[in-house]
Amino acid sequence: MKRRRTIRIGVIADTHGLYDPAIERWFAGVAQILHAGDIGRRDVIQRLRKIAPVVAASGNIDDYEKSGLPRRVIIRRGKIKIAICHVLYEKGQLTKDAEKWLDREQPTVCVFGHSH
């Protein structure tokens, strides 16, 4: 029987340009950080990258064309397929666009923000 390896992943969203130094304590030892958008300022990502590699999607306050970040990201960790985006719901409803994307991608896990 193959032994499973546990990987810790830090998940964050909606930082809006703010970086709480406590993140360094919370994310100590993570293998990767997923940021689900509304980053706000590039230095937030730069500081997170000092902790672990970062995969990020742009949010509605992050002009995604200027940020260079995609609106949606799919990554794989072994057999786990992770979908990362910012806006999945609007007014308590899954958006039609998001529903199509999720139906097409069939992720195991979906990480999103914009829920505040």
Label the model's feature ranges.
Residues L34, V87-L88:
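Short, surface-exposed loop/turn motifs that are enriched in glycine and acidic residues
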Residues M1-V54, D62-R71, I75-K79:
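N-terminal active-site segment of His-dependent metallophosphoesterases
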Residues V55, E90-H116:
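Conserved beta-sheet core of the metallophosphoesterase superfamily
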Residues D14, D38, G59, H86, ...:
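Active-site glycine-centered loops adjacent to acidic/histidine catalytic or metal-binding residues
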Residues E24-W26, L69, L88, K96-E99:
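Surface-exposed beta-strand edges and their flanking turn/coil or helix-capping segments
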